[in-house]
């Protein structure tokens, strides 16, 4: 039960962070308070950092919101491809 509650709180903080209501530093401080400065806390902070710098919402080579494609069409007229969590215009995945 406690693990599920922790996961729920963590996902809630990620959702709030993606809406720009809170910044990355405040979420990482909350992780330090709730989880602590241990291995699990470090992993959680790394995930928050990776998602916070994700500008076009690319996740695992997928563009669920279409933000990458829209950005590339406006910027260069090329097709947008997600490479992990990064958006690249006109550069398809090679694997």
From Swiss-Prot:
Q: What sections of the sequence does the record tag as coiled-coil?
A: none
Query: Where does this protein chiefly localize?
Result: secreted
User: Which function does this protein serve?
Assistant: Has antimicrobial activity against yeasts and bacteria.
This one is known as Opiscorpine-2
Q: Which residues does the UniProt record annotate as the domain BetaSPN-type CS-alpha/beta?
A: 55-95
- GO annotation terms (biological process): defense response to bacterium; defense response to fungus; killing of cells of another organism
Q: Which GO terms describe its cellular component?
A: extracellular region
Q: Which UniProt keywords apply?
A: Antibiotic, Antimicrobial, Disulfide bond, Fungicide, Secreted, Signal, Toxin
**Localisation:** Secreted
Q: What are the disulphide bonds in this sequence?
A: 58-82, 68-87, 72-89
Give the family per the record: Belongs to the long chain scorpion toxin family. Class 3 subfamily.
Which first-to-last residue range defines the signal peptide?
A: 1-19
Tissue range of expression?
Answer: Expressed by the venom gland.
